[in-house]
Swiss-Prot record:
GO molecular function, one term: ATP binding
Catalytic activity: UDP-N-acetyl-alpha-D-muramate + L-alanine + ATP = UDP-N-acetyl-alpha-D-muramoyl-L-alanine + ADP + phosphate + H(+)
InterPro entries: Mur-like_cat_sf, Mur_ligase_C, Mur_ligase_C_dom_sf, Mur_ligase_cen, Mur_ligase_N, MurCDEF_pg_biosynth, UDP-N-AcMur_Ala_ligase_MurC
Lineage: Bacteria, Pseudomonadati, Campylobacterota, Epsilonproteobacteria, Campylobacterales
PANTHER family, per database record: UDP-N-ACETYLMURAMATE--L-ALANINE LIGASE, UDP-N-ACETYLMURAMATE--L-ALANINE LIGASE-RELATED
Binding positions for ATP per the UniProt entry: G108, A109, H110, G111, K112, S113, T114
Protein name: UDP-N-acetylmuramate--L-alanine ligase
First and last residue of the signal peptide: none
Length: 431
């Protein structure tokens, strides 16, 4: 089985799998609906990418792997089935990809990309497959001739149950993606239990409402007791968080916010099973953050422009707390949040929580909902966010942002939130 075709190869998670299998020696091709930064990068790396989908793209392929966004009526998927080509979802393909590896898997509703990437910086002999771009490597995949592999495991489609972890970290088990679990929290929690039970080594946030009751042996982090003297600073506009962990001394990590200390602590406790504490302390300094997580696109004395992937109230609240600290340390005038809601169902379910999350900002700008394939739900957002400015679009002009209604945003800390298209709106072509 040499020729593998990926349908939906432009996705952040599936592109990492494609890159990994290419490094393992397979001949990789892929397709997507439209060109993107990821598809262009893949082409530069030698992957044949076809835009848009067409049934002929799967001719002479031994295996087809498709993303969760691909429907049965997709022309490539349908034709592959007709020709009898083996088709695997991303979830079904994981055992094939991870089968011979010692997997260090990180799961959780929030913080898994950050925790995975910090762990990858600490375990520098491991391959890495995550759903975000590691800034120090410029990729979502690192291939090493090693048995070890750091993997960001996804609970949204229960694919984390196919990751066969040697070591499992769970950052938290807050209810997200419940539609996949029949809207039953108990089913989601049962899946987390299964994920942890498989692992030889388990590291958990023991103050999470569900995880605190986990019965099997595990390494437990109690953030309120174990993380002390958490402080933040800015060096040349770069954010850093310092903290003390248990009796292990002080650590300093790139990024801003208490949640960074929590994610780093979980990674440190996991790495302690394989490395001495001073090696961990030193390697932690190599971590440079991940793209779209408090990602500073421009910074000077008057203006800071930040791109953030936060699309759930819990994430937004934590990131805005970090933003307030940055504003205080840097002496900036105000905070402007630009919010592109992601999925109607998430917005409808968490409307009150979103309103509360944005309470501390000086200005709130709201873009149209990024539907991600969902049918629209009628919502009176102006009643929920009475002080917000609603605009159809926003674009970057130089270091400033200009809204479709003509407003210019040019001072203070400006932060964009969303998992849809907002990142492209905030960035210039070279960012």
């Amino acid at each position: 089985m040499q020729n593998i075709h990926f349908i939906g190869i432009g996705g952040i998670g599936i592109s990492a799998l494609a890159r990994f299998l290419k490094e393992k020696g397979f001949k990789i091709s892929g397709s997507d609906l439209k060109e993107s930064k990821i598809t262009k990068e893949l082409e530069k790396e030698g992957v044949k990418v076809s835009i848009p989908h067409h049934k002929d793209n799967i001719l002479n392929k031994d295996l087809v792997i498709y993303s969760a966004a691909i429907k049965e009526e997709n022309p490539e998927f349908k034709y592959a089935k007709e020709l009898g080509i083996k088709c695997l979802s991303r979830k079904e393909a994981l055992p094939l990809i991870l089968e011979d590896k010692r997997v260090f898997a990180v799961a959780g509703a929030h913080g898994k990309s950050t925790t995975s990437s910090i762990l990858a910086s600490l375990l520098d002999d491991a391959s890495v497959i995550i759903g975000a771009i590691l800034k120090e490597f410029g990729s979502n995949m690192i291939y090493k001739e090693s048995q070890n592999l750091v993997f960001e495991a996804d609970e949204s489609d229960s694919s984390f149950l196919n990751s066969n972890p040697y070591l499992a970290i769970v950052t938290n088990a807050e209810a997200e993606h419940l539609d996949h679990y029949g809207n039953e929290v108990s089913k989601l929690h049962h899946a987390y239990t299964q994920f942890l039970d498989v692992a030889k080594i388990r590291v958990i946030n023991a103050e999470d409402e569900f995880l605190k009751n986990y019965k099997n042996e595990s390494i437990k982090l109690y953030p309120s007791k174990d993380i002390k003297n958490c402080t933040m600073c800015i060096e040349n506009f770069k954010p850093f968080t310092s903290f003390e962990l248990k009796d292990l001394g002080e650590f300093k990590v790139f990024g801003m916010g208490y949640h960074l200390a929590l994610d780093a602590s979980l990674a440190i406790l996991a790495a302690l099973n394989f490395l001495d504490i001073e090696t961990i302390r030193t390697r932690l300094k190599n971590y440079q953050g991940i793209k779209k997580r408090f990602d500073i696109l421009h910074a000077d004395e008057n203006l800071v422009l930040i791109d953030d992937y936060g699309h759930h109230p819990t994430e937004i609240k934590a990131t805005l707390s970090a933003a307030q600290e940055y504003v205080k340390l840097g002496g900036y005038k105000k905070i402007t949040a630009i919010f592109e809601p992601h999925r109607y169902t998430r917005l409808a379910t968490n409307l009150k929580e979103f309103a509360k999350a944005f309470e501390g900002v000086d200005e709130l700008v709201i873009l149209p909902v990024y539907a991600a394939g969902e049918e629209p739900i009628e919502l009176d957002l102006k009643a929920v966010f009475p002080k917000a400015l609603f605009v159809e679009d926003i674009k970057r002009e130089g270091k400033f942002l200009v809204a479709s209604k003509g407003q210019v945003f040019e001072e203070g800390l400006i932060i964009g939130f969303g998992a849809g298209d907002i990142s492209n709106k905030l960035r210039q072509k070279n960012e």
